[in-house]
UniProtKB/Swiss-Prot annotation:
InterPro entries: CDO_1, RmlC-like_jellyroll, RmlC_Cupin_sf. It comes from Bacillus subtilis (strain 168). GO terms for molecular function: cysteine dioxygenase activity; ferrous iron binding; oxidoreductase activity, acting on single donors with incorporation of molecular oxygen, incorporation of two atoms of oxygen. Its cofactor is Fe cation. Keywords: Dioxygenase, Iron, Metal-binding, Oxidoreductase. Belongs to the cysteine dioxygenase family. It comes from the Bacteria. This is Cysteine dioxygenase. It catalyses: L-cysteine + O2 = 3-sulfino-L-alanine + H(+).
Amino acid sequence: MELYECIQDIFGGLKNPSVKDLATSLKQIPNAAKLSQPYIKEPDQYAYGRNAIYRNNELEIIVINIPPNKETTVHDHGQSIGCAMVLEGKLLNSIYRSTGEHAELSNSYFVHEGECLISTKGLIHKMSNPTSERMVSLHVYSPPLEDMTVFEEQKEVLENS
């Protein structure tokens, strides 16, 4: 079975899903890493490849490819909740808190192949690939992404005395 058909079967009937529903459904895709290969895009307008492969009124599914030593911007997902499963490599997920126009780093952790990360409504984060191999992940958001906010990362300034 092709990835699109698996997604339709697994996600097509979901109505107003929770983060747990999204994670459970993602993990049900058989051979997700292999089935996702034809949908992996190289970077174009962003520092990473992004391919929206499925969308209905309830959710949107995207394949993300972050090349070695690249990262996303610091962002939120608007009014959407989400879940992402790492299919290849590992990613560093950095959580931020808003300080107005800027965002301040709060916490970071690695997500390894086969593991999921969740995004609750209002979560601000950045995904990075600090390794020498690409990182590929499969993301599902509900409702479909709209009105995302990109934040300027607040860097620590060290003073010389």
